[in-house]
Amino acid sequence: MRVKRAVHAKKKRKKFLKEAKGYRGALSRRYKLAKQMYIRSKWYSYVGRKIKKRDMRKLWITRINIAARNEGLKYSEFIHGLKLAGVSINRKMLSELAVNDPEAFKEYVRIAKEALAS
């Protein structure tokens, strides 16, 4: 018996063309190109999720560095001082404090300075 695939093939093509809606030019109209771009877009989103983590950490460190330098410490000295003092707070929280609650951040800077001095 002959196997007819028309329904399944059309369904498969339609799925990729639906996902590729909004792509520019032939990328949203031609099945082969739409499929390639769909696969590539999924790869970009996967890689983007990994890069986002790096970028956020860089942003936190930059914010902490600026706030610490305003108080007279470099970022590396500040982090080292916190470790010597036994304070375990992550960079995300330090960044939030630096932006939203400068007084609390100054307290952490004071703790780090005391630990470095002793």
From Swiss-Prot:
Gene3D superfamilies: 6.10.160.10, Ribosomal protein L20. InterPro entries: Ribosomal_bL20 (IPR005813), RIBOSOMAL_L20_CS (IPR049946), Ribosomal_protein_bL20_C (IPR035566). The keyword Nucleotide-binding does not apply. GO terms for molecular function: rRNA binding; structural constituent of ribosome. Keywords: Ribonucleoprotein, Ribosomal protein, RNA-binding, rRNA-binding. Disulfide bonds: none annotated. One of its GO terms (biological process) is translation. SUPFAM superfamilies: Ribosomal protein L20. GO terms for cellular component: ribonucleoprotein complex; ribosome. Pfam families: Ribosomal_L20. It comes from the Bacteria. HAMAP family: Ribosomal_bL20 (MF_00382). Binds directly to 23S ribosomal RNA and is necessary for the in vitro assembly process of the 50S ribosomal subunit. It is not involved in the protein synthesizing functions of that subunit. Belongs to the bacterial ribosomal protein bL20 family. This is Large ribosomal subunit protein bL20. It comes from Thermotoga neapolitana (strain ATCC 49049 / DSM 4359 / NBRC 107923 / NS-E). The lineage of its organism: Bacteria, Thermotogati, Thermotogota, Thermotogae, Thermotogales.
